[in-house]
Amino acid sequence: MGHSSYLTGAPSSEPQSIEESLYELENTSVLFREAWQRVPPDFVRASRASAKAMAHLDHLVNEILRARDTRIARGTYAGSQLEADLNIMRGKMFAPVTVAQQQAMIAAGPGSGNLPGDAVQITLERLLNKVKHRHHQSANFRIEASRHIFVINVDRPNKMPDSIAEFDVSDFCTHCIQAAKHL
């Protein structure tokens, strides 16, 4: 619901468009990384940037998956440019995982998020689904060669551990920009 402010008279804090969310996600990732790498780290600023980034990430994921589902329902997805864009390898995943492995990823501490073993590459479409079904309070990250890598725990619908996935936030945004052109 993009423009709900008319209902309450208050300005909406919801993202207005996919393009805006992509822009904001890229920017907040940079702000987060800079705050985290300061000496001493600026945890307040990093936390604020992270919260803002998550709102934009969720908006992007929901909009792209909704558009995909609409195209599937209309019979216009198979063979489309959107399908091609979503089939690009864009993240990594380690599966199956145990609860202990998911807990260890968090226990490693902020900035030390890693997959517990050899990963397989996953498509942007699969990554979007992993992001959608992530533990919202169970994520980590690392800064690697000035890149912000987001690491997430994912469960199956029955709440059993499914996987741990990771992606480079900047690369994710670049590929979502391409996919958004074909929604």
Regions found by a protein language model. Give the residues of each.
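Acidic, Ser/Thr/Gly/Pro-rich intrinsically disordered interaction regions
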Residues: 2-55, 62, 69-183
